[in-house]
Amino acid sequence: KQIGLGSSSGTIDTMHSTSATQSTGRTLDLAIDGDGYFRIDTGDGTAYTRAGNFYLDNTGTLVTGDGYHVLNMNGGTIKIPTDAQSFTIGSDGKVSIVDAGGQSQDGGQIGIVTFANSDGLDKIGSNLYRESLNSGTASAANQPGDGGTGSLKVGFLEMSNVDLTDEFTEMIVAQRGFQSNSKIITTSDEILQELVNLKR
């Protein structure tokens, strides 16, 4: 005879709150200080991320660590000529390039989008999300700091928003609960054994 249904996980929630940033000094490291997501072209649709550790591929295109293209305000890619002398990214997301001839060029602008319900985004791995019915559609791309989006910090990365103190506390509480339940089972077994012995 089975008594009870055991235990199972309910929901797994993702915390979308902002966290502290850490300076890296690297031009392609970008952190959103506030609400918002970068738009990413995965090849089979648009995804969204807050992870701003970007790179340049062999064609000079701005990509994620997995090689997905980072999109600009207009939904296009951002490309730095491979022979450019230098480039910078401003806090407004604008990419400025000094080409091989020493001339300044506009490299486009990184846009940030927001959602009515970020908690409703679907996780697809590699710190990427897709919009869902629960999240609503993404807003139009905004310049960082506009339209309710957070500002852009260049040369910084957002750290984990996990509170280790809270997590350790919850783990200890769960461990104590498990130990108490184990003790109850042991005591119940002992009582049943005593009853069996009395019957004999």
Give the predicted meaning of each segment:
Residues 1-200:
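Amphipathic alpha-helical polymerization modules
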